[in-house]
Amino acid sequence: MATGKIVQIIGAVVDVEFPQDSVPKVYDALKVDAKEKGTLVLEVQQQLGGGVVRCIAMGTSDGLRRGLSVENTDRPIEVPVGIATLGRIMNVLGEPIDECGEIGEEQRYAIHREAPSYEEQSNETSLLETGVKVIDLICPFAKGGKIGLFGGAGVGKTVNMMELINNIALQHSGLSVFAGVGERTREGNDFYFEMQEAGVVNLENPSESKVAMVYGQMNEPPGNRLRVALTGLTMAERFRDEGRDVLLFIDNIYRYTLAGTEVSALLGRMPSAVGYQPTLAEEMGVLQERITSTKSGSITSVQAVYVPADDLTDPSPATTFAHLDATVVLSRQIASLGLYPAIDPLDSTSRMLDPLVVGQEHYDIARGVQSLLQRYKELKDIIAILGMDELSENDKQAVSRARKIERFLTQPYHVAEVFTGDPGIYVALKDTLRSFKGLLAGEYDDIPEQAFMYCGAIEDVLEKAKKL
């Protein structure tokens, strides 16, 4: 194996000089023995000429110095895949960080792989029921599709994702991969213990677990956060290629972009709009195109997307939009009214909300709900200035129903039971459609609107109304 030496260190970016005849390829993994710090892995990003390569460190570069010997492995970063990864927490390099011994994998895959070709891809469309009323009604998910949860800080992306993991992963009993990209370590910890309680992680017999976890948290260097999503995706691809249906949860895709921004300037690239890397669209495309279903199995991905300053036109969320089949937009305005989940039914969209896919009845009910809410939104200014009395009878009725619908779109979550004390409710799609159909038809006009708050199907509302 060829050896070189470090010639420059700037934060997470390290330049290494090799003999001219043995320069490493782009994406090759290099190893540095940093004595007391252990072995550090570098990933080649650029060849600068003169035998010098520019690399990103997959760990902290503290303790490195010029002149240290670097070894070329002649291979890209490879991570464990297969059954051995289930029930384990790993870092970007696939090393265990849960203090439960070695992974003991039978096979390793390189994290950089080609996306499946057109011939291999599957184009079947079937619905994935989530048990969350507003999602199943307004922005239904596709099995094998890509779903984005968009929202600013503190409006409930992670809680919604946890509920989806609880409802889909536990109900659908398939395998899941959870990639924590640049999120809080506490959330990763909470998730691990919740999965143990739910029986999804089995510590006695890890091979019976249903989820593999890969974490590159907020405190990690940018190299880890930039590559950890690829590590999780590689593990999911292996399960898919074995003919399984996999769920891939990524929290948060924005931090993946941000890590690219952090190293982009150090790699000598000119920043583009808002300081993002010029390769933003390409980096996002490389990741998203690999998340796809083939004829052998499917990957359904749910990605949380942080929206900086609640601005959906920011280049990072705007680039992500283009790749998704369903977008769930969380609204700070709805959250401020105390209506949770704070999903905006007018902003959220889905490719699956099509009469040919969900059926004419579902489509009509969803559009009916949206048009009522839109009418209420238009009338809000008039109500604020002149009051309800100035509205026509039709408009008064529309406002009354819209307010009931707004409240009926709320729902107690299983994962929020700890803070709210209300037991979570899973609402089947047929119950959701039946309930909203009755609401639109005016069957429940005589029921007070507070009875609609935090209920499951319409039977719960009628039960609650009796107690009021």
Curated annotation (Swiss-Prot):
| Reactions it catalyzes | ATP + H2O + 4 H(+)(in) = ADP + phosphate + 5 H(+)(out)
This enzyme's EC code(s): 7.1.2.2
Its subcellular locations are: Cell inner membrane
| UniProt xrefs under InterPro entries | AAA+_ATPase, ATP-synt_VA_C, ATP_synth_F1_bsu, ATPase_a/bsu_AS, ATPase_alpha/beta_chains, ATPase_F1/V1/A1_a/bsu_N, ATPase_F1/V1/A1_a/bsu_N_sf, ATPase_F1/V1/A1_a/bsu_nucl-bd
The residues that hold ATP are 151-158
Please indicate which superkingdom the organism of origin belongs to. Answer: Bacteria
Here the disulfide bonds are none
Q: Which UniProt keywords apply?
A: ATP synthesis, ATP-binding, Cell inner membrane, Cell membrane, CF(1), Hydrogen ion transport, Ion transport, Membrane, Nucleotide-binding, Translocase, Transport
Q: Which Pfam families match?
A: ATP-synt_ab, ATP-synt_ab_N, ATP-synt_VA_C
Q: Which GO terms describe its cellular component?
A: plasma membrane; proton-transporting ATP synthase complex
Membrane topology per the entry is: Peripheral membrane protein
Q: Which SUPFAM superfamilies match?
A: C-terminal domain of alpha and beta subunits of F1 ATP synthase (SSF47917), N-terminal domain of alpha and beta subunits of F1 ATP synthase (SSF50615), P-loop containing nucleoside triphosphate hydrolases (SSF52540)
For this protein, what is any one GO molecular function term? ATP binding
Q: Which family does the record claim for this protein?
A: Belongs to the ATPase alpha/beta chains family.
Complexes and interactors: F-type ATPases have 2 components, CF(1) - the catalytic core - and CF(0) - the membrane proton channel. CF(1) has five subunits: alpha(3), beta(3), gamma(1), delta(1), epsilon(1). CF(0) has three main subunits: a(1), b(2) and c(9-12). The alpha and beta chains form an alternating ring which encloses part of the gamma chain. CF(1) is attached to CF(0) by a central stalk formed by the gamma and epsilon chains, while a peripheral stalk is formed by the delta and b chains.
Kindly give the NCBIfam families that the UniProt entry links to this protein: atpD (TIGR01039)
Main function: Produces ATP from ADP in the presence of a proton gradient across the membrane. The catalytic sites are hosted primarily by the beta subunits.
Q: What is this protein called?
A: ATP synthase subunit beta 1
Source organism phylogeny: Bacteria, Pseudomonadati, Pseudomonadota, Gammaproteobacteria, Vibrionales
